[in-house]
UniProtKB/Swiss-Prot annotation:
Belongs to the phosphoglycerate kinase family. It comes from Bacillus cereus (strain B4264). It is found in: Cytoplasm. The lineage of its organism: Bacteria, Bacillati, Bacillota, Bacilli, Bacillales. Pfam families: PGK. This is Phosphoglycerate kinase. One of its GO terms (biological process) is gluconeogenesis.
Length: 394
């Protein structure tokens, strides 16, 4: 990575404004999944060990520029203190006199959590005045929030206009892993693209067709490709306005020598429920009032075989409606194939794919699980991320 990280700067005694991603799911004031807090620990611990005064900023939920009591970061600060094994202070503001006073009272190695930055309307507008207020608290800006790196907000990008700006360890790792996958991949390189909609994945499919040896398609978006081949798809998801594009992608794959894999059989149903009756049919045999909801067993075998023979696999998007047991087998099979493939480096592109490997207890078998759904998708589309562009070059 050609951006400076916290390893490249002197931190002792410095006030560090560190943007983290503590946007964790909450239920009745309790954190239900603390993965994102744990992901930030190495950076926070490094800053503490280096004798920095660690000022943490994050958003939580979508308060839309207003104070929403349930979205305060107080429970997060409390849990962070437990995980760090030290006293973590919490400010009820994200800038201004109260925050400044608390920062002024900090000693080297102290940790302070600021209030939810999205309580202020200027955050999502990347307001320069708000960015200046944040910058006034600190000597150095550290961005460790890869999950928000695709957003040009005051605390992720704007603040870098007023302070030296470097990446944290999590951000550095994300950029290294994803950057290497796209610029210098080990081969065979396979991308697995799933999820519901073609329109969400157009950019990533187009960009990856220039990079990969194999492209595997699954999930709801597969049926647009199936229809593009002239097959009936019953009530399956389809974007009729993307059929021509699907044809174009298949033609492009052929021209570029990319092996393009699509389902050969699918799981179909007449209803969405945990007790739904399902059938397995060939891809050209979906009845008119049934809907495709997962890849079938033959497809799972083919996909697993491609995975096993790949050196690098990037996975973005599930193979079916994995949240429901009858439609989860395809996604589970892809996860299992990745877990079993010992010579394969697996990169899970955040969002639903990350949720799936967590759900099936396979997370520890994956080489890298990205902490950013939207950010990793935009990175894989070849877009520049505002939260990265703003960092100082080495």
């Amino acid at each position: 990575m050609n951006k400076k990280s916290i390893r490249d700067v002197d931190l002792k005694g410095k006030r560090v404004f560190c943007r983290v991603d503590f946007n964790v799911p909450m239920k009745e004031g309790k954190i239900t999944d603390e993965t994102r807090i744990r992901a930030a620990l190495p950076t926070i611990q490094y800053l503490v060990e280096q004798g920095a005064k660690v000022i943490l900023a994050s958003h939580l939920g979508r308060p839309k520029g207003q104070v929403v009591e349930e979205m305060r970061l107080t429970p997060v600060a409390a849990r962070l203190g437990e995980l760090l094994g030290k006293d973590v202070k919490k400010a009820d503001e994200a800038f201004g006199p109260v925050a400044q006073e608390m920062v002024a009272a900090m000693n080297e190695g102290d940790v302070l959590v600021l209030e939810n930055v999205r309580f202020y309307a200027g955050e999502e507008k990347n307001d320069a005045e708000l960015a200046k207020e944040f910058a006034a608290l600190a000597d150095i800006f550290v961005n460790d929030a890869f999950g928000a790196a695709h957003r040009a907000h005051a605390s992720t990008a704007g603040i870098a206009d007023y302070l030296p700006a470097v990446s944290g360890l999590l951000m550095e790792k994300e950029l290294d892993v994803l950057g290497k996958a796209l610029s210098n991949p080990e081969r065979p390189f396979t991308a697995i693209i799933g999820g519901a909609k073609v329109k969400d994945k157009i950019g990533v499919i187009r960009h990856l067709l220039d990079k990969v040896d194999n492209l595997i398609i699954g999930g709801g978006l597969a049926y647009t490709f199936v229809k593009a081949l002239g097959h009936e798809i019953g009530l399956s998801l389809c974007e009729d306005d993307k059929i021509e594009l699907a044809k174009e992608f298949m033609q492009l794959a052929k021209e570029k020598g990319v092996n393009f894999y699509m389902p050969v059989d699918v799981v179909i149903t007449e209803e969405f429920s945990e007790t739904a009756t399902t059938k397995i049919v060939g891809i050209d045999s979906i009845p008119s009032n049934w809907e495709g909801v997962d890849i079938g067993p033959k497809t799972r075998e083919i996909y697993a075989d491609v995975i096993k023979n790949s050196k690098l696999v990037v996975w973005n998007g599930p193979m079916g409606v994995f949240e429901m047991t009858p439609f989860a087998e395809g996604t589970k099979a892809v996860g299992q194939a990745l877990a079993d493939a010992e010579d394969t480096y697996s990169v899970i592109g955040g969002g639903d794919s990350a949720a799936a490997v967590e759900k099936f207890g396979m997370a520890d078998k994956m080489s890298h699980i990205s902490t950013g759904g939207g950010a990793s998708l935009e990175f894989m589309e070849g877009k520049e991320l505002p939260g990265v562009v703003c960092l100082n070059d080495k």
